[in-house]
Amino acid sequence: MHELSITEELLKTIVAKAEEAKARKISRINLVIGEYAGVVEDSVKMCFDILSQDTMAKGALLEFKRIPAEFRCRLCGHTFPSGQHALVCPKCQGWNAEVIAGNEFFIESIEVDDESQSS
């Protein structure tokens, strides 16, 4: 399960950024995941819940925004969404398409409680 190593790095990055901002606690993390990123949301959530137990991210809400796959035909330049025959261009029927969206996986934003706020 590669989600474990992905989530470990994700947590390190999130905690480091929160510490830079002098945050007291991380409350929400907004992630962007492309349709073809090969990342399973439920697995990331499960790993995050376990790995974040002794960190400022414990109990933080993970939100996922899915980006649909989009392709560009290398023959005619037409762009099109994924479908039943994702790699076949619907315009020229060519089989030479490249993925131009849908491979993303990144942190969109982190919401924190700063040190100046009281509990």
From Swiss-Prot:
Keywords from the named record: Metal-binding, Nickel, Zinc
N-terminal signal peptide: none
Positions with a binding annotation for Ni(2+): 2
Coiled-coil region(s): none
Pfam families tied to this protein: HypA (PF01155)
One GO MF term attached to the UniProt entry: zinc ion binding
Described purpose of this protein according to its UniProt entry: Involved in the maturation of [NiFe] hydrogenases. Required for nickel insertion into the metal center of the hydrogenase.
Family, similarity comment: Belongs to the HypA/HybF family.
Protein name: Hydrogenase maturation factor HypA
Gene name, Swiss-Prot/TrEMBL: hypA
